Amino acid sequence: MSITLEIETKNYLDDLLCIKKHLSHMESLLNCYASYALSEPSSKFGWTFFKLEFKSNFQISISKKFSDILAKYQYNDDTGKFTKFMSDYFIARGCNVKVNSVT
């Protein structure tokens, strides 16, 4: 099962670069490559929205590697925990974005 996240940003180019950079680091850490896809952006009310789809092997690898952190999140479902983890991951690395799961 792959997870798709909706990313919201006010500074698309800078935050896109930040996200790509840190996803690349994550891919290297987990030995997964070409493991996510980005949609075309759309803008509304000063915000830019785009989707980030994780391929299942990348999502599973992240979940296994960081299972101890994911277990601490107060969500009932794995998708909610994964979404919160990725939001915290991007924010901790200077990406000024909001992250929501797409159902």
PLM feature spans:
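Generic structural motif
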Residues: 5, 32-41, 95-102
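A general secondary-structure signal for short beta-strands and their flanking turns/coil
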Residues: 1-4, 45-49, 92
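Alpha-helix boundary/N-cap detector
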Residues: 14-21, 57, 61, 73-85
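Conserved short beta-strand edge segments in small beta-sheet-based binding/regulatory domains
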Residues: 70-103
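Short, intrinsically disordered low-complexity segments
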Residues: 31-75
